[in-house]
């Protein structure tokens, strides 16, 4: 059985989500994609991913924020600056951490869930935050 080629929306989904990778954005800027009018038209076209019927497929929703930022020429120029790129990356990581905290998913709660799933089974080690386990 032959594998079918990916559909256009699958390719666009993958590309839109790749925009959440700040180092990839820097690569695009270094190779002058972010100053190419055709590429910028494509970026503008991809705004349809902000619609709920499409955005529900996104695993990395921060890519939509980046898609918006890419509409700004100053952002496209600044992403070449290492300090700016690092600040954007750090801000994005903080957003992910804050979002996890809002939804109750923290490293501590994940570990507590693992320990609870172990129950009273003494053959299973428990998982502790400091990295040590017990039998």
Curated annotation (Swiss-Prot):
GO terms for biological process: regulation of DNA-templated transcription. Belongs to the Mediator complex subunit 31 family. Pfam families: Med31 (PF05669). Keywords: Activator, Nucleus, Transcription, Transcription regulation. Component of the Mediator complex. The keyword Transcription applies. The gene is SOH1. This is Mediator of RNA polymerase II transcription subunit 31.
């Amino acid at each position: 059985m032959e594998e079918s080629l990916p559909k256009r929306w699958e390719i666009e989904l993958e590309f839109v989500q790749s925009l959440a990778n700040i180092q990839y954005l820097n690569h695009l800027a270094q190779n002058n994609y972010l100053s190419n009018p055709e590429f910028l038209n494509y970026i503008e076209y991809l705004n349809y991913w902000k619609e709920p019927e499409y955005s529900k497929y996104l695993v990395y929703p921060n890519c939509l924020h980046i898609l918006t930022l890419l509409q700004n020429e100053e952002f496209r120029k600044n992403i070449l600056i290492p300090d700016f790129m690092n600040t954007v990356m750090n801000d994005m990581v903080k957003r992910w951490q804050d979002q996890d905290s809002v939804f109750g998913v923290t490293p501590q709660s994940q570990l507590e869930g693992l320990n609870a799933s172990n129950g009273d089974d003494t053959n299973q080690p428990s998982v502790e935050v400091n990295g040590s386990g017990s039998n």
